[in-house]
Amino acid sequence: MAKKSKVARNAQRKALVAKYAKRRAALKARIRDRTLSYEERRAAQDALASLPRDSNPNRVTNRCALTGRPRGNLRRFGLSRIAFREKALRGEIPGVIKSSW
């Protein structure tokens, strides 16, 4: 199990990303808009830099829904490789069967 504080911090980051998503997208569009003057684009860059650091989606870590493990995650299932294997062997994941050839 991951530390509860790490899982909670990641959840807080997800909330911040959702809260600032529209504002961040609008600022990035202004930065890329070549019709604006340099000063306006620079002001948009400064505004983007002044947003909370944790509102950047790159800072959100994919974690296992069961254990909070940050590494070895399968995106499709939202589980770590270990939790996925345990659930699959118990038959708790529909459509997943152990391979044999």
Curated annotation (Swiss-Prot):
Keyword Transmembrane: no
Molecular function as annotated in GO: rRNA binding; structural constituent of ribosome
Top-level lineage group: Bacteria
Signal peptide: none
PROSITE patterns assigned: RIBOSOMAL_S14 (PS00527)
Region (Disordered): 47-66
InterPro entries the UniProt entry points to: Ribosomal_uS14, Ribosomal_uS14_bac/plastid, Ribosomal_uS14_CS
Coiled coil start-end: none
Keyword Cell division in annotation: no
GO biological process entries: translation
Gene Ontology cellular-component terms listed: cytoplasm; small ribosomal subunit
Quaternary structure note: Part of the 30S ribosomal subunit. Contacts proteins S3 and S10.
General function of this protein: Binds 16S rRNA, required for the assembly of 30S particles and may also be responsible for determining the conformation of the 16S rRNA at the A site.
PANTHER family named among the record's database cross-references: 30S RIBOSOMAL PROTEIN S14 (PTHR19836), SMALL RIBOSOMAL SUBUNIT PROTEIN US14M (PTHR19836:SF19)
Protein's recorded name: Small ribosomal subunit protein uS14A
